[in-house]
Amino acid sequence: MDMDPWLLLTLILGLAMAWAIGANDAANSMSTAVGAGAITPKQAVLIAGILEFTGAYFFGKTVTETIRKGIIDPSRISDPNVLVYGSLAALLGATIWLVIATKYGLPVSTTHSIIGGIVGYGVVYAGLEIVNWGKMASVVLSWILSPIVGAIFAFFIFKAIRRTVLESEDPIRSAKRWSPVWIGLAFVVIGTMFYIKVLHGKSLYMGVLKLGIPVGLVVFLITSMILRVKFPKVDPYLGAEFIFRRVQVITSGYVALAHGANDVANAIGPVAAVYTIATMGMAGAKVPVPRWILALGGLGIAIGVATYGYRVMETVGKKITELTNTRGFTIDFSAATVVLIASWLGMPISTTHTVVGAVIGVGLARGVKAINKSIVRDIIISWFVTVPVAGLISAIIFKILWIVG
């Protein structure tokens, strides 16, 4: 087969997938900051766009797996044409589902979408035995674990922040004492996450020592100084909210940067596979990723956030429950902590599901009536149909390509 038109088509679909990731998943990173009023939607898309591109281009992995997450057995695919058609089908299946979900403002997992696409074409080509069902079980487990653990963490962290900062007997003293502690702890987690997720460090222990503790300590000292100098005797609640508002922009910005570094692979993995086949004849289990393909993925994500990200931002930031800066900070802190612990334990986790779970947890800390139950129901349904719908679309597209190709 002549590879040039197939490579061009894959590049176009990779860009489309990156756009869809930006519109849905990347928009999620800024949703709590927008919902809490820390920044405007226009500021959010600008910040997210720049940081997503930066994360993808400068910190995206230069080697990516052709078969994401080991979800199907690559030894059963020896024909390069199958990998080309499969990559196209998986990209298109995932992209179509992400666009549908985004249109209705539903935050879904882009990783689960591409997994569905891969399983769809794999089953059509080689039957059910090609699927690693143990791995699929861990994906299903992540649907259940991620939001529950995220909600539990956020519920208790917000209760603790409310008790130590917002509702204590001596609020001025408590705000000065405890706000820097909570913010410092959050930055220990964020510094460690940056080491592992963005710089791709292997050791959690080294991440805590090299970046986590130093960053957390510096932020603790800066926050303490600001509260003492700028808010000596004024309303401590306003002082705490002021600090949390500024911090929330930083935590959301980190989420955007890390998301670009990690999830760009969902769009460019299949593109890199087809590019390697076009230039070298066949792709192995891992393929090199040229910088220009990383740039393509980063650009697509940035454009997606800017042009269509507002729908998911509105759902997560405003429709599930009412957010303030302390609640928004709690969500970011909880989600980052859960993802870090899950990575350390090797547990399957979805960042999207964890963030939504944390939003629900913060709402539940104020009572069940603070939650928009119909929105939560729609989101949960969308999570459970993500893999089957993306898989079905991918299967149909692969079958058509296999027949006409």
From Swiss-Prot:
One of its GO terms (molecular function) is phosphate transmembrane transporter activity. InterPro entries: Phos_transporter. Keywords: Cell membrane, Membrane, Phosphate transport, Transmembrane, Transmembrane helix, Transport. It comes from the Archaea. One of its GO terms (cellular component) is plasma membrane. It is found in: Cell membrane. It is a multi-pass membrane protein. The keyword Transmembrane helix applies. GO terms for biological process: phosphate ion transmembrane transport. The chain crosses the membrane at residues 3-23, 44-64, 82-102, 114-134, 138-158, 181-201, 207-227, 264-284, 287-307, 329-349, 384-404. The keyword Hydrolase does not apply. Its main location: membrane. It holds the Pfam family PHO4. Belongs to the inorganic phosphate transporter (PiT) (TC 2.A.20) family. Potential transporter for phosphate. This is Putative phosphate permease PYRAB14010.
